[in-house]
Amino acid sequence: MSEILPYSEDKMGRFGADPEGSDLSFSCRLQDTNSFFAGNQAKRPPKLGQIGRAKRVVIEDDRIDDVLKGMGEKPPSGV
């Protein structure tokens, strides 16, 4: 197994025409790329019973009962 050595300033490379000029420091870290490459593959498609079903919605309107009762009593006009 390979040995991991501590990172030091001596190991950093210098860039530009003048190596003694301004320093450009950077660090490179490995990140978990599984989620990047997986994309939508990790998300499963919905089951047949779940298609078209909305999540529970809470309606906070005091007039909703009157509106719902009024819709059942009146036939649609102009249709």
UniProtKB/Swiss-Prot annotation:
Family in the record: Belongs to the CAMK2N family.
Cellular component terms (Gene Ontology): cytosol; nucleus; synapse
Localisation: Nucleus; Cytoplasm, Cytosol; Synapse
GO molecular function (one): calcium-dependent protein kinase inhibitor activity
Protein name: Calcium/calmodulin-dependent protein kinase II inhibitor 2
Region ranges (Disordered): 1-21
Pfam short name (any one): CaM-KIIN
Function: Potent and specific cellular inhibitor of CaM-kinase II (CAMK2). Traps Ca(2+)/calmodulin on CAMK2.
Residue numbers spanned by region Inhibitory domain: 43-69
Matches recorded under InterPro entries: Camk2n
Assembly and oligomerization: Interacts with CAMK2A and CAMK2B in the presence of Ca(2+)/calmodulin or after autophosphorylation.
Keywords, ordered alphabetically: Cytoplasm, Nucleus, Protein kinase inhibitor, Synapse
Tissues in which the UniProt entry reports expression: Highly Expressed in keyhole limpet hemocyanin-stimulated dendritic cell (DC) and weakly expressed in unstimulated mature and immature DC. Highly expressed in kidney and liver. Moderately expressed in heart, skeletal muscle, and placenta. Weakly expressed in the small intestine.
PANTHER family the record matches: CALCIUM/CALMODULIN-DEPENDENT PROTEIN KINASE II INHIBITOR 2 (PTHR31007), CALCIUM_CALMODULIN-DEPENDENT PROTEIN KINASE II INHIBITOR 2 (PTHR31007:SF1)
Organism listed in the record: Homo sapiens (Human)
